[in-house]
A protein has these predicted regions:
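Conserved N-terminal entry element of GNAT/NAT acetyltransferase domains
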Residues: 1-29, 159-160
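Acetyl-CoA-dependent GNAT
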Residues: 25-91, 108-110, 114, 118, ...
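A short, internal acetyl-CoA/4′-phosphopantetheine-binding micro-motif in the GNAT/acyltransferase core
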Residues: 92-99, 127-128
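Conserved beta-strand-loop-alpha-helix junction that forms the acyl-donor binding cleft
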Residues: 125-135, 156
């Protein structure tokens, strides 16, 4: 489990409070909260966005289904998929009130660690090309080794 450093308590300055955010594998009882997070984060629903499918994911590949928890509330999530050949990042989402705190970047880094531990040498992120804020986020991760693959509109990096 990774904890963020304290965020500061200067509310008049616009800074967040001192609550820490923990990143860890999702628990079965948190799947409904993840679905709600995806909805409030503006994710486009897919056929697998059901409580049953997420609970199955927790059961079968739970170490790659990560959540960010603040004050017992799911404020972020990411799915790190491993197919035995390449690691893939899906469904990166952060609650609007938890944005601009590098939480999405922390979730991506933790997902990369999970996949590296499984043997992944290359990572890929599926990004919806019409989501300008998402594309901007991944472009910003060039400092972490991510680069855009123009042929497929995906981002890849070595999992070193």
């Amino acid at each position: 489990m990774i904890r963020a450093p304290p965020m500061g308590r200067k509310s008049r300055m616009g800074l967040r409070d001192d609550a820490t955010i923990a990143i860890r594998p999702c628990r079965r009882e948190e799947c409904a909260a993840v679905l709600a997070l995806w909805e409030c984060a503006g994710a486009i629903p897919s056929a697998t966005d059901t409580l049953e499918e997420l609970q199955r994911l927790v059961r079968t590949h739970g170490d790659g289904f990560l959540v960010a928890i603040q004050r017992n509330t799911v404020v972020g999530s990411v799915i790190a998929g491993w197919d035995g050949w390449r690691g893939n990042i899906y469904r990166l989402a952060v609650a609007p009130e938890a944005r601009r705190r590098r939480l999405a970047q922390r979730l991506v880094r933790e997902a990369a660690l999970v996949m590296r531990a499984k043997g992944s040498r290359r990572l890929s992120a599926l990004v919806e090309s019409h989501e300008a804020h998402a594309v901007g986020f991944w472009d910003h991760l060039a400092a972490d080794g991510w680069r855009r693959d123009e042929r497929m509109m995906r981002y890849i990096r070595a999992s070193d």
